[in-house]
Amino acid sequence: MEIAALSPDVPPLAACALQQHPLYGAVLSALGGTARRLAMRRKGRDIGQVQIVRRRFGPLCIDWLPRGPVWQADTGTGARIEALRHLPASQPGRALWLASPDSPQDAALFRPLGYRALMTPQYVAELDLSPTQSARLAAQHGKWRNRLRRAQASGLTVYARPFDPARDDDLLGQELAQRRTRRYAALPPAFTHAWAATAPQATRLYLARNKSQTVAFMLMLLHPPAATYHIGWSGAQGRALSAHHLILWHAASDLAGRGFARLDLGHVDTHGSPGLARFKIGAGAHIRPLGPAMIRLRP
């Protein structure tokens, strides 16, 4: 088994999670972090890719494998386990290894190697952009679709463009205030600025306006061939007019037209955030489990 550094210019093998895309690693590096992207090869053939994030807490070094690896579709179970077995020894120094597998099936690959679950799996919402617009509309739940139609008839206009840090910093401030009020966590504004600085065209900002007033927005991060919902905000008027229903519909159609295969809408928590969960499910997103957060207890 050969494990070697992989150039950021090499595209991912599939529509991977944001955390396994080379842009994510580049942004972490810009923020002073360490991310290493690796190719896994067996008998001269690429079988997978993986991005590892290294973090230090005083003397403790942690290597974290988020939402990966990304495998060639025809790579067998034995080869996958073999690659994961060789991964820690291929990296410099000693570290505590953590993993957040992308699926329960991937989690099963880690267990024979001494990994044990720390937390129960989370669920994520993924919107498939490959069906036709009419098919995506039909996949929406009835109440969601009715709110979309009311928003379409409200006079709201949706505009789309790349995120501009100088022009749009006030939007980040509005979303940050919303976070504090609703007590939810998200990546800091510094991450948004670093992403926009690293890849200015890899953002897509959708603004809903009533006449000249912005009443809601959503910001997507682009990591072809997938995109990820990053942050959003809605004021009282935007909520009354179901502006986020209209924005998400426009965003899905826009991204599909640009060749994106999937829009990741983030975690689904039916207990902690039931309203947001209903919004994602009602939009027609597919809900699936990730693997649990895992720690390597033995080499």
Could you say what each language-model-derived stretch is?
Residues 66-76, 130-131, 231-241, 269:
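A short, internal acetyl-CoA/4′-phosphopantetheine-binding micro-motif in the GNAT/acyltransferase core
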Residues 2-43, 47-59, 104-105, 109-120, ...:
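A conserved beta-strand-loop-helix scaffold within acyl/acetyltransferase catalytic domains
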Residues 95-100, 159-160, 207, 262-264:
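A structural signal for short, well-ordered beta-strand segments and their strand-loop junctions
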Residues 81-89, 192-195, 200-299:
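Aromatic (often tryptophan-rich) hydrophobic motifs at membrane interfaces
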Residues 78-121:
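Non-catalytic accessory segments adjacent to catalytic cores
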Residues 39, 51, 63-66, 98:
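Short, conserved beta-strand segments within well-ordered enzyme catalytic domains
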Residues 1-7, 54-57, 110-135, 257-299:
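Active-site/acyl-donor-binding loops of N-acyltransferases
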Residues 60-73, 92-96:
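Glycine-/proline-rich flexible loop or hinge segments
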